Structure formats: C-alpha cells, structure tokens
Regions:
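Cytochrome P450 core scaffold surrounding the K-helix E-X-X-R motif
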Residues: 50-55, 130-131
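Short, P/G- and charge-enriched loop/turn segments at secondary-structure junctions
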Residues: 87-93, 136-142, 148
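Glycine-rich beta-strand-centered segment in the early N-terminal region that forms part
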Residues: 29-45, 59-126
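Nucleotide donor/acceptor-binding cores
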Residues: 8, 118, 192-194
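Short, Lys/Arg- and Gly-enriched loop/turn segments at beta-strand edges
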Residues: 127-138
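Mid-domain Rossmann-like dinucleotide-binding core that forms the NAD(H)/NADP(H) cofactor-binding site
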Residues: 166-216
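Glycine- and charge-enriched low-complexity intrinsically disordered segments
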Residues: 150-160, 166, 177
Length: 216
C-alpha cells in the first residue's frame, strides 16, 4: 500500500454547465489525508442524478426547467451563488462522484493503521454540525471532492468496512440510492406491512423494495 503516486487521473468539473465543463486530466495531485481522514483508492464510483444536477447547477432557485432541458448544453438561468445542493457556491475545479467504493491505502493522524487495506463504502451525505447550523451537511463530490478519480480522501468515520461478494461496480451503486430509500421508509414509518412503491424500476425505487423486504 506504499506505492501511492503523486499524480492521478480523474475528471474535473470546471464550472456549472454542459458536458464541456467536464475535463479529463492525468496530472491531478493525489490528495493527502488530514487528521481523521483516510486516502481511498477508488475501485468503483456510481453516477447518479445528483452528479448531473450539480454539474448543471439545477439546484439554483432561478432554475425552473427540468434537467432534460440542459443535460448536454447546460441551463441558462443558473445563479452560481446557490447552484449547489447546500446553497453554498462550489469551489472549482471540483471532482464529482458521491457514490464511492474502494480500498483504504493511507490514513491521517488519529486513524488506526490497521484500517489500511480495508474495503469500504463512503457515506455520501455527511453531517458537519456548526454552532449556527447543527444540521449542516456536506456531500461527497459537491462540497468536497468525490470519487471520479483514482484516489479520494474521506472522513474515516464516514468510511464503512464492507465484507461482501458484490463487485466494486455493484457496491458503488449503493450509497445514495439506498440511503435515500431508507430515509423515505423511515419517514413513512414502514413496518411489517404491504406497501406500494411507485417508480420502482430506478435506483431509489429498487432499493426501497429491498429495504422494505428486510422489514418483513
């Protein structure tokens, strides 16, 4: 795990807009994990609507059209000041990718060395409470760099060990879709009962089916 390069390949998001805002690079500095963080060699990274919406700036309050209207060329009415998931201007260039499966290859101060070599999934949305906002959140690939590169850093406490026969690609489809579905089921207080899940063919819908089945 010591053969960590200084540079890596990845995709930069250079601003809100169309596909031209995505730039593939092979000279991106490999990040260094800070205290409480781990460096992850990315093995799989899912693409979901949050990545697309963030690129477009669709979360801006000025946007009234749907994402299909600007998927390739971008949207015209975006205000960069509130175009992110958290209403905070993004810092560019940004590496997107909120769904991350990988291997811990280096740890920062305060993180146990025995975590190196662990296969993990990263929680996509992470609580970062402040005095003024106890519910403040950050999203991988939005407020901080995500998994669309060979390496990324994440908080150690948000990187969960996985012991599973699923492939890296399969596991990379889990974090956002399953956490969204679980939140919906918890909010609806689903117990052992028969329910109808509409739109069940997508990532969140299919996750909701599996999580509902676990409840009996």
């Amino acid at each position: 795990m010591n053969n960590i390069p200084k540079l890596m390949s990845g995709v930069y998001l250079t601003g809100h807009g169309g596909l031209d805002k995505l730039v593939y690079r092979e000279d991106i500095p490999v990040p260094t994990p800070q205290a409480g963080e781990v460096l992850i060699e990315v093995k799989g990274a899912g693409v979901n609507n949050t990545d697309i919406n963030t690129r477009l700036g669709w979360y801006s309050k000025k946007v009234t059209s749907d994402t299909n209207a600007g998927g390739r060329e971008g949207l015209q009415e975006v205000d960069d000041d509130d175009a992110s998931w958290s209403d905070v201007p993004l810092q560019f260039p940004r590496i997107q990718g909120g769904d991350i499966c990988g291997i811990i290859v280096q740890v920062g101060e305060g993180v146990e060395q025995n975590r190196i070599g662990t296969r993990i999934l990263v929680r996509s949305m992470q609580n970062i409470p402040t005095k003024d906002n106890p519910l403040a959140m950050q999203t991988m690939g939005s407020e901080v760099d995500g998994g669309f590169a060979q390496y990324c850093v994440a908080k150690a406490k948000e990187s969960f060990p996985i012991n599973c026969e699923w492939s890296d690609t399969e596991l990379a489809s889990i974090p956002i879709s399953y956490s969204t579905a679980e939140g919906m089921l918890c909010r609806a207080d689903i117990q052992k009962e028969t329910i109808l899940i509409t739109g069940a063919s997508g990532g969140v819908g299919s996750a909701a089916i599996q999580l509902a089945k676990v409840r009996g």
